[in-house]
């Protein structure tokens, strides 16, 4: 693999399995500039179309889900590894759903179910975008619902 810093060839110096063997993490060292970097390998197993609320269809995009979760978890005590694991769990649920098309609501509910127990602030942030709260009253209802379940 080419070095992202100088485009020289690299060598693997460490390999580890993550996410119960679903992901392989490799530490690499460039043979030219001697800098180190990390790569990840994972099987692209989720091959479904997401049906949006407006009826549009688009291919499932892991990176899009990761971006949304990173925004929700911004400045919260949630590591990148935890977010990655959450997305892997959601993908496992999508595979179990066993359909060629999945409503975006299924993905959103899977994420919110996991975020609720992980971090309440990140949950509310994600829910505010996912559920498109139109006013403060709707947001208040979501917060009150969260507080009742404690």
Curated annotation (Swiss-Prot):
Q: Name one GO molecular function term.
A: zinc ion binding
Keyword Transcription assigned: yes
List, alphabetically, the PROSITE patterns matched. Answer: ATP_CONE
The record's cofactor note says: Binds 1 zinc ion.
The record, for Pfam families, names: ATP-cone, Zn_ribbon_NrdR
| Keywords, ordered alphabetically | ATP-binding, DNA-binding, Metal-binding, Nucleotide-binding, Repressor, Transcription, Transcription regulation, Zinc, Zinc-finger
Entry's Gene Ontology BP terms: negative regulation of DNA-templated transcription
InterPro entries, alphabetically? ATP-cone_dom, NrdR-like_N, RNR_NrdR-like
Start and end residues, zinc fingers (unnamed): 3-33
Q: Which residues does the UniProt record annotate as the domain ATP-cone?
A: 48-138
Tagged with keyword Hydrolase:
no
Q: Required cofactors, per record?
A: Zn(2+)
Stated family: Belongs to the NrdR family.
Described by its record, this protein's role is as follows: Negatively regulates transcription of bacterial ribonucleotide reductase nrd genes and operons by binding to NrdR-boxes.
Protein name (Swiss-Prot/TrEMBL): Transcriptional repressor NrdR
Q: Name the species this protein comes from.
A: Herpetosiphon aurantiacus (strain ATCC 23779 / DSM 785 / 114-95)
Name the encoding gene, please.
nrdR
């Amino acid at each position: 693999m080419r070095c992202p810093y100088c485009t020289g060839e690299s060598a693997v110096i460490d390999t580890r399995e993550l996410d119960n063997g679903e992901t392989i993490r490799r530490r690499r060292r460039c043979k030219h500039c001697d800098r180190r970097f990390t790569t990840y390998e994972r099987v692209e197993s989720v091959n479904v179309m997401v049906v949006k609320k407006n009826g549009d269809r688009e291919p499932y995009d892991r990176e899009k889900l990761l971006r949304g979760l990173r925004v929700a978890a911004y400045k919260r005590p949630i590591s990148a590894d935890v977010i990655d694991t959450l997305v892997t769990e959601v993908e496992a649920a999508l595979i179990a759903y066993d359909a060629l098309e999945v409503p975006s609501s299924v993905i959103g509910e899977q994420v919110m179910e996991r975020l609720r127990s992980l971090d309440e602030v990140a949950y509310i942030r994600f829910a505010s975008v996912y559920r498109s709260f139109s006013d403060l009253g709707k947001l208040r209802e979501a917060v009150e619902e969260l507080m009742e379940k404690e």
